[in-house]
A protein has these predicted regions:
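PAPS-dependent sulfation machinery
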Residues: 173-261, 305-313
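PAPS-dependent sulfotransferase catalytic domain
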Residues: 227-230, 236, 241, 249-375, ...
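Conserved catalytic segments around the Walker B and adjacent sensor/switch elements
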Residues: 169-172, 345
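Basic, ligand-binding patches in group-transfer machinery
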Residues: 2-136
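A conserved segment at the C-terminal end of the G1
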Residues: 156-168
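The Walker A (P-loop) glycine that initiates the GxxxxGKT/S ATP-binding motif of P-loop NTPases
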Residues: 149
Length: 434
């Protein structure tokens, strides 16, 4: 198995090809090969796939079922035409996809999947690899406190409690749901795409908006220049994006300063892993709430506002929502909790509501922050004062009434679906099933 040696940016450790099936004559990944890839955070995947009868719509490059690239199958492949004489489409059965590996954690697994025009999806290949971690700052700067959670779990309450500590800063959590670090991390990820950093050398149309994001993906003919653009230049850009995050929160904290800034993140995002590379002192907190109460809150909050959010549609299939929206997100949270990368700390909404002082003191202590009784009591008191008038954010008369509401609000058949689909996850996070 290939290893990530000093100076190597990216290595492919294993490639699995699915080969022929009832639907396709075959397929392959020609590039990259197993072993060290060209010295760049950009990854180019080139190959071919040939359908037997049903035409191919496109090839998808997926990470954890989320598409990173969707490309047509139309590149000239005279070699495949020669190997499959008389087979329609063999001469143009090639595909080419480019992605930034900064949209992946340092160790990753990609799935290549083809979609036929009738909607059938078939795996083509699986790639496992690793990339170099981004250079980190010195650690003296303000560090991210990453709250990883799902909507209607009490995240705004927790952000307010955390930012009541003198060493933690957040931007007006009950007014704006600020995502400053996500913004700059996304800027970094998008500009680290080969289609972006190669765009200045073959711009398709300078009059087209955002041409710098999806320009050319051809080769420059200057290997060293292309290597620098895809590695050293990306690391310089990473430092710039990190500096922008730090500058915003340093300005927000004022002359007193702060050790942490706190923002929310979603389970599917790679951003917490990326920030953990950029910041040596990054910490992660996972917030959960009884999933059944959370579902009740999502439904009630959407009805209260009169529009759909959190992936839930009024009048939709609640069982399908539990299976296809809630389960994947909660499973990802569980995966993060088991991981060791950011040493995540688990906190439950119910503990914040029923015993905020001990829950908050334990969290502050875990973060290495002052956690004396007076400071914690003042943080809880300040939060209660700030949230007293936030009725528009609530769906019950008070937070205590929101605990266990599912016993009355959730139809029995949906509660049973939650038990069936989410039972092991409920137990893992410390909740009892039916």
């Amino acid at each position: 198995m290939a290893s990530l040696t000093a100076g190597t940016v990216l290595t492919i450790e294993e490639i699995e090809i699915n080969g022929a099936s009832d639907y396709v004559h075959g397929g392959n990944v020609d590039s990259p090969r197993e072993g060290p890839a060209p010295g760049s955070y950009g990854l180019t995947i080139e190959g071919w796939v040939l359908s037997r009868q049903i035409p191919i719509e496109h090839v998808e490059v997926l990470y954890q079922e989320r598409p990173l690239a969707v490309v047509p199958v139309e590149r000239a492949r005279p070699d495949i035409a020669a190997g499959f004489p008389g087979i329609e489409g063999a001469d143009r059965s090639g595909f080419l996809a480019t992605i930034s590996t900064l949209k992946l954690p340092p160790a990753f697994e990609l799935v290549l999947r083809t979609k036929l025009v009738d909607g059938t999806r078939l795996p083509v290949a699986r790639l496992r690899g690793r990339r170099r971690r981004l250079p980190a700052g010195g650690g003296e700067e303000i560090q991210p406190l990453m709250l990883n959670t799902i909507g209607r779990s009490g995240s705004t309450l927790l952000v307010t409690l955390l930012s009541s500590h003198p060493d933690v800063v957040a931007f007006s959590p009950f007014i704006k749901d600020a995502r400053v670090s996500t913004y700059w991390a996304n800027v970094l990820q998008d500009l680290a795409e080969p289609a972006s950093y190669l765009a200045p050398f073959d711009p398709p149309d300078l009059e087209r908006p955002h041409w710098w994001l999806d320009g050319g993906v051809g080769e420059l003919g200057e290997d060293e220049v292309e290597r620098w653009l895809g590695s050293d230049s990306i690391e310089l850009l990473s430092a710039h994006c990190r500096a922008q995050i730090e500058a915003f929160y340093a300005n927000l904290a004022g002359p007193e300063g702060a050790r942490f800034f706190v923002e929310k993140y979603l389970p599917y995002q790679v951003i917490p892993d990326l920030l953990a590379e950029m910041y040596p002192g990054a910490r992660e907190v996972i917030l959960v709430r009884d999933f059944r109460d959370m579902l009740c809150s999502v439904i009630a909050f959407n009805r209260k506002r009169g529009w759909s959010d959190f992936g839930y549609t009024e009048g939709g299939d609640d069982a399908k929502y539990v299976r296809e929206v809630m389960h994947p997100s909660l499973a990802r949270l569980a995966e993060r909790l088991r991981g060791e990368g950011t040493r995540p700390y688990l906190i439950r909404y119910e503990d914040l509501v029923l015993g905020p002082e001990p829950a908050l003191a334990g969290l502050f202590d875990h973060l290495g922050l002052a956690a004396d009784e007076k400071l914690v009591a003042e943080a809880v008191k300040r939060t209660r004062e700030e949230t007293a008038s936030m009725d528009h954010h609530r769906t019950t008369s008070d937070p205590v009434a929101s605990i266990g509401r599912w016993h009355d609000d959730l139809p029995g058949e949906i509660a049973a679906v939650c038990d069936e689909e989410l039972g092991p996850l409920l137990a893992e996070f410390g909740y009892e099933a039916l």
